[in-house]
Amino acid sequence: PDRYQSARALVLKIYHQHKGRYGYRRIRLACRNEGVLLNGKTVRKLMKELGISSLLRVKKYRSYKGEQGRICDNLLKRNFDAKRPNEKWVTDVTEFKVNGKKLYLSPIMDLYNGEIISYNLATHPQPSMVQTMLTDALKQLSKDERPILHSDQGWQYQMSRWQRWLKDSGIVQSMSRRGNCLDNAVIESFFGTLKSECYYLNEYKNVEDLKRDIIDYINYYNQLRIKEKLGGLSPVQYRLSQAA
């Protein structure tokens, strides 16, 4: 008898469940979560036999930048680890193109578990885009929580009104050094993942279709997409497990 028959079926099920986005490492973790222990070498072998492979990572897109300036210090200093929720947030804006039209995504990520806690989609990168995103994020704070919010030096974050919104809300502003994308590497990495696992895989006819897919993907990313760093749990699963 084929000793890997049920394991092979599970690998295939997980692969299709996640629309081909998982490579052998995440499939191994997902199998473990279902009580099936396989090493990476075995998972790769089974995937090869099944003729499946993870979708290729496409090179990282450079996010939308404004004029360079000097507004505040880099308080994060590439320390992307947070010991509790709502301690360190990061944000940025990225751009998508569909048939000559543009769509902008502005999210806030919590570095505690990599969860996208708030985001806004807009066809123009206006101040209201980041304001709406910030307002939604603030609703999740208890009165004692005062996160650092880190960004690059994009024009949105240099606006005096953005600084005022943060100050009035008790949020501590932090900014990357000039021209240094590694200072905000985690949110840049999220954009790369989103684009390679969603945007680049489809040919969109209009902005509305893309918008719908991004909303679906962010929900998937938060609720279902497991991470080795989080012990094989998704961001939301990890947060709930730590709070229990």
Segments (PLM) and residue ranges:
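Hydrophobic (often cysteine-bearing) scaffold residues that line and stabilize catalytic clefts
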Residues: R3, A7, G23, N39, ...
